[in-house]
């Protein structure tokens, strides 16, 4: 639903404009359509590469990165302060769609699924907001994502997400032999 500037040889893809000015508008956006457009072409490319014996790493963006294309960040921060119950619904609306996408990536043969939300780091959100998001969304969301991991599919987490989970004691480092 976002307006995307695909970029050029100097700068890559980025938001071209916002489609929402209030966080409640996000709840009225249609679900992602995985059956057409670039998203479908990417899934088909994944399938073809796996059929040819290649390993496929699929990067999946988290809710803050997606929101960064849909709405100005100041409205997101305002919503988190003044409308936390709406923001929880927004996170889960996006989270459910992200999870569906990850399920499709697995179905199409993606064997490494990388989850990153660079716009949702502690350096942007601050420690208090980061902790709230990690406890109320990121951790429960990733518990659902964890179900996708098996002997054919590995889930990779970006360092910011990993450190947020460790910092809130929702995860710990474990040595594997």
Functional labels for PLM-detected ranges:
Residues 1:
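Segments that shape or occlude catalytic/ligand-binding pockets
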Residues 10-48:
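A gly/proline- and charged-residue-enriched helix-loop-helix capping module
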Residues 34-177:
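Active-site loop segments of alpha/beta catalytic cores
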């Amino acid at each position: 639903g976002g307006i995307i500037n695909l970029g050029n040889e100097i700068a890559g893809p980025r938001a071209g404009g916002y489609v929402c000015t209030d966080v409640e508008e996000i709840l009225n956006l249609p679900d992602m359509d995985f059956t057409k457009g670039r998203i479908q072409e990417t899934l088909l490319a994944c399938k073809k590469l796996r059929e040819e014996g290649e390993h496929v790493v699929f990067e999946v963006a988290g809710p803050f990165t997606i929101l960064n294309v849909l709405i100005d960040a100041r409205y997101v921060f305002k919503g988190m302060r003044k409308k936390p119950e709406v923001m929880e619904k927004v996170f889960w609306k996006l989270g459910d769609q992200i999870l569906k996408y990850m399920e499709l990536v697995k179905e199409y043969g993606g064997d490494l699924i990388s989850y990153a939300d660079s716009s949702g780091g502690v350096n942007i959100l601050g420690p208090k907001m980061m902790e709230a998001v990690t406890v109320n969304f990121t951790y429960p969301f990733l518990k659902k994502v964890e179900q996708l991991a098996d002997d054919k599919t590995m889930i990779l987490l970006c360092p910011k997400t990993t450190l947020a989970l460790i910092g809130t004691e929702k995860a710990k480092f474990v040595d594997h032999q």
